[in-house]
Amino acid sequence: MSGYKEAFKKAFPYTIPVLTGYLFIGIAFGVMYAEKGYSFLLAVLMSLLVYAGSGQYLAVNFFVPGVSFLQVIFMTLMVNIRHIFYGISLLEKFNKMGKKRWYMIFGLTDETYSLLCTTRIPEGVEEDKFLFAISIMDQSYWVIGSAIGGLAGTLIPFNSEGIDFAMTALFVVIFVEQWMDKKNRIPEVIGIAAAVICLQVFGADSFVLPSMILIILVLFMIKPRLEGKEDDICQ
């Protein structure tokens, strides 16, 4: 247990940006959920068992008459399909984590993935425990935010118009932090270019999957040039 205690202690400073972001977007989710007339306990339960970030924001609009089960499955897949690519890059690392790998797979979000790929393991801490601590703390921030937002939304009337932009804002902040922290920004430039091109070609509703495929293909082709230049541990 002392190993886990040290891992959580060392991991916490790295999760502070996620803490500030997840608390606010978790609160926003809770408020939106409560505005639909649902109990804040259900919002907390969803954050514990589903933990899908943008998928949960989308799910708020699914709990209405006329939305079919197939529509829910399709839209959720489209929103979260990028996680397939995240998982592929972390397969080797997760396979070394024993039973903890099942939670690591479940707890993989955009922000957690970013930390797992860019954070260097501090000395004196086991890698699997350190990465596990990051994932656990990130989800706890989301759950706490959902509880606060759900409770506040139940007790205080809110106008939630535009509140779902909080998730987009968090993505932008994390990207900017990554950009400023790196010397080699080729992968980021490729990501921006691929997204813009696919947005123009496929439209706003269908560009995510083609963008991810294009990014993976281009990075794979130029990987020999990037090796030794990039800091990411997910390469």
Residue ranges: model-predicted function:
Residues 1-11, 124-126, 223-235:
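Intrinsically disordered, low-complexity non-transmembrane regions of multi-pass membrane transporters
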Residues 10-105, 119, 141, 207:
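Pore-lining transmembrane helices
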